[in-house]
Amino acid sequence: MISKLNNLNDIRRDSSKCGIYKRWIYKKVDYNKMCDYMQKINYSIQDLNSTIDNLKKFDRRNIIFIISLVDWIREAFNAIIGVINSKVISNFRFLKQEELKRHSEYFKAIRSFVVAHPLNTTKHKEYGLDGNFICVDIREDIGLFPWVKMQDKYVLTLDGLKKEDCSNMDFYLYCYSDKDDNMSYFKKVGCRYSDIYETAKLYIEKLYALDNYLTKNARKKDYE
C-alpha cells in the first residue's frame, strides 16, 4: 500500500517573509528560479499521487514515469539548496539525512538501471550494478513467458541487489549477465514501488524541515 505524498500547501507562498520564500536569502534572479523549482516539485507530487491507483494494473510506462518524477523532485530540491545564500543554511541539519542518503543512493541506482543507462550501468557497485547486468525489459511477471530460460532470481532494495526469492514484488527487471554466463539466461530482479515513493517522501520532508528552519532561524539583520 502506497500512501499519498504530502503536498506543499503548508509552505506559505503568500508571504515573502516566511521560510523558503524569504526574498533576501536569494539573489534577485535566483528567487525566481526557486519559485520555478518549487512549482516543479509541486507538479511532480501531484502526478505521483494521481498515478498511485494506476500502479494496481501493470504498465511499464508508469514505472518510467514515476522514476522520472522522483528524479525531478530530487534535482529540484538540490537546485533550491544551490541558490540559497550558503551562509544562511550553513547550520541547517535534517534529522533523517542518513536515511535520505540511503534512499537517494538506491534511487540513483535504479534510475540508472531502468531509465538512464539500462545497457551500461557501471557506477553503482554497492547495489550490484557494476556493469555485469544489462536490463533488457520491465515486466509484471516472468510467468507470462514459460519458455524463457531463467537462471537466478534477485531483489533490488535499499540493501542492494541480493539473490533470493523475488515473489510478490511489484515489478520485475529482465536482465542478462555477459560475465556470469555469457548472456545465456535471464535474471529476474524484483523491485517495489514503495522504495521509489519513499525517496520522494524524504525529500519532501527535508523541504519542509528547510522551510521551518528558515522561518525560525534566518534573520536578515544577522547577515547584513
Model-predicted regions and their roles:
Residues R23-K87:
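Short, contiguous, well-structured surface segments enriched in hydrophobic/aromatic residues
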Residues M1-D36, Y43, F94-E224:
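Acidic, Ser/Thr/Gly/Pro-rich intrinsically disordered interaction regions
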